[in-house]
Amino acid sequence: VIYTVVAGASSGILCAVNANGSEKWQYVLPGDTPYGGAVIGADGTVFANGGKAVVAVTADGSLKWQFDLDEPVQNCVPLVDNRGYVHFITDKATYYVLTDEGKLYGKKSLGTKSFASPVMGPDGMVYIAAQEEAKSFVFGLGTGASGYADSAWPMKGQNPQRTHLQR
């Protein structure tokens, strides 16, 4: 199964497509996501962003949880760690970590804007870029995780090197 996000005029759509090209299911996201994408947790949960929210959708297309925000998260693909926690950064550069149940674990302002997606090394360290007053910064943040999720696609580009090679 391939999971993809399709941008729309007012909302994005998270789609599951079978190997033969037929649609398995689709889930309408709570807002547009022109540069977002989907990632997969170790248990098969699919995570995506849309508008001012991040959602967790089960492998059969049912909503597991939705985390609503006060600011847009349209330019980031989430990341899921080995605990099932979801990491992302908003367009206004607020870095969030949610538990596997969709509850806030932590957040931190890293600047004024971001067009990046977090990447996690095999040691659980998260790297993320943000901007502040025309200056760009890359942050390395300890997360308490011991690595990214053992799944087919835990982050943008599939792995820390962004090779897009599915295992």
Region spans (language model):
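Extracytoplasmic/lumenal domain signature
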Residues: 1-167
